[in-house]
């Protein structure tokens, strides 16, 4: 909104030109969402508690989790609300992909909310039927992909920088230029990325602050990548694809990072609120959508290796038990394996954060090492 008002009424005033700078608006977006989250945090927690939106605990889960029972959930409402408000204030709403990101983040959050509502209010064990949830995820992802690949993601001829590419091309880390031309397979591949990412983050959200912190680190990293990818000088210097308008995604990502750091204030151990599927589904899906916009789908395997390992641990555990009758891990997802192994919850979370920072550094290094 501020950018729109400046561009419409005040672009002749040099003193207000700062509102046109992406770096300034990104920083302000992060601070705004963070302080909105701080300000509304206790109010939202009390509101959720009053409505009996409370967490239930797995019967077969670690005994230490019994104390978490009854903690308010659906805190993802706080994250998505702060994010959208900040983007509305500081984002360039003329950038169609900012609108698309915001709308589809809200769609995934609504899907997660419906699942949480069924579990915590309707007391339906397991919440929404897995098949229904999966099909709705596919539908939302499909609409996003159609909009991006056929409308908002089309790059005008002559605006691809030093590295020419098609929007359906696939890039690999440490490799200069596109590796595969996906063509018609770009949409099903992208749907797989979004759904895989959303469910992987959902599985990671099992300890106080674990998903919040690791996603925040990934979001900050992608914000840096978005900025350099959307700036022709840096994109050409680094020999990465120049994506017109991508630097505006850094405003969206900064707002999301601010909301996550603000939420972590209340979600750190011992958690006063959980994000629930309302938060984890939309956060994972947003990571997936962002890497598609930035042509960094494969990089997410490195940057989000924690989420990948959490999802793989569940797949391996289920597969091993069905085939051999034996379990590989004490419990899946992976963080519960360490927990049952005697490692304290806070130590697991902090170690995972450290690993996430290392993965972020490696991911950023791929911009130059190729």
UniProtKB/Swiss-Prot annotation:
Keyword Glycosyltransferase recorded: no
Localization of this protein: Cell inner membrane
Annotated metabolic or biological route of this protein: Cell wall biogenesis; peptidoglycan biosynthesis
Required cofactor names: Mg(2+)
Database matches in PROSITE patterns: MRAY_1, MRAY_2
Protein's GO biological process: cell division; cell wall organization; peptidoglycan biosynthetic process; regulation of cell shape
One Pfam family here: Glycos_transf_4
A cellular-component GO term for this protein: plasma membrane
Entry-linked InterPro entries: Glycosyl_transferase_4 (IPR000715), PNAcMuramoyl-5peptid_Trfase (IPR003524), PNAcMuramoyl-5peptid_Trfase_CS (IPR018480)
Reaction equations catalysed: UDP-N-acetyl-alpha-D-muramoyl-L-alanyl-gamma-D-glutamyl-meso-2,6-diaminopimeloyl-D-alanyl-D-alanine + di-trans,octa-cis-undecaprenyl phosphate = di-trans,octa-cis-undecaprenyl diphospho-N-acetyl-alpha-D-muramoyl-L-alanyl-D-glutamyl-meso-2,6-diaminopimeloyl-D-alanyl-D-alanine + UMP
TM region(s), chain numbering: 31-51, 73-93, 98-118, 135-155, 177-197, 209-229, 251-271, 273-293, 298-318, 347-367
UniProt superkingdom: Bacteria
Gene Ontology MF, one: metal ion binding
Top-level class of the enzyme under EC nomenclature: transferase
Keywords: Cell cycle, Cell division, Cell inner membrane, Cell membrane, Cell shape, Cell wall biogenesis/degradation, Magnesium, Membrane, Metal-binding, Peptidoglycan synthesis, Transferase, Transmembrane, Transmembrane helix
Membrane topology, from the record: Multi-pass membrane protein
EC code(s) of this entry: 2.7.8.13
Role: Catalyzes the initial step of the lipid cycle reactions in the biosynthesis of the cell wall peptidoglycan: transfers peptidoglycan precursor phospho-MurNAc-pentapeptide from UDP-MurNAc-pentapeptide onto the lipid carrier undecaprenyl phosphate, yielding undecaprenyl-pyrophosphoryl-MurNAc-pentapeptide, known as lipid I.
Family to which the UniProt record says this protein belongs: Belongs to the glycosyltransferase 4 family. MraY subfamily.
Protein name (database record): Phospho-N-acetylmuramoyl-pentapeptide-transferase
Gene: mraY
């Amino acid at each position: 909104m501020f950018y729109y008002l400046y561009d419409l009424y005040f672009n002749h005033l040099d003193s207000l030109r700062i509102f046109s700078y992406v770096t300034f608006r990104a920083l302000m977006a992060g601070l705004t969402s963070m302080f909105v989250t701080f300000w509304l945090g206790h109010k939202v927690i009390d509101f959720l508690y009053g409505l009996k939106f409370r967490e239930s605990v797995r019967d077969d889960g670690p005994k230490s989790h019994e104390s978490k029972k009854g903690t308010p959930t659906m805190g993802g409402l706080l994250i998505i609300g702060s994010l959208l408000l900040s983007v509305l204030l500081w984002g360039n709403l003329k950038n169609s992909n900012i609108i698309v990101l915001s709308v589809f983040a809200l769609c995934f959050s609504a899907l997660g909310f419906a699942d949480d509502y069924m579990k915590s209010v309707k007391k339906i064990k397991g919440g929404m039927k897995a098949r229904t949830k999966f099909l709705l995820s596919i539908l939302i992802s499909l609409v996003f992909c159609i909009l991006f690949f056929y409308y908002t993601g089309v790059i005008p001829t002559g605006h691809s920088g030093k590295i020419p590419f098609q929007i359906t091309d696939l890039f690999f880390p440490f490799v200069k230029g596109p590796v595969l031309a996906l063509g018609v397979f770009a949409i099903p591949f992208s749907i797989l990325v979004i759904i895989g990412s959303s469910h992987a983050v959902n599985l990671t959200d099992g300890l106080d602050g674990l998903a919040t912190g690791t996603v925040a680190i990934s979001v900050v990293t992608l914000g840096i990548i978005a900025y350099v990818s959307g700036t022709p000088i840096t994109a050409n210097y680094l020999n990465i694809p120049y994506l017109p308008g991508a630097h505006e995604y850094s405003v969206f990502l900064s707002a999301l990072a601010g909301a996550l750091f603000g939420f972590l204030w209340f979600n750190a151990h011992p958690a006063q609120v959980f994000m629930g599927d309302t938060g984890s589904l939309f956060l994972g899906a947003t990571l997936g959508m962002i890497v598609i916009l930035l042509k960094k789908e494969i990089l997410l395997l490195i940057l989000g290796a924690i989420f990948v390992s959490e999802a793989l641990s569940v797949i391996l555990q289920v597969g091993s038990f069905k085939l051999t009758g034996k379990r590989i891990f004490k419990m899946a997802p992976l963080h519960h394996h360490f927990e049952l192994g005697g490692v304290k919850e806070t130590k697991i979370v902090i170690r995972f954060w450290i690993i996430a920072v290392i993965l972020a550094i490696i991911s950023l290094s791929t911009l130059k090492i190729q």
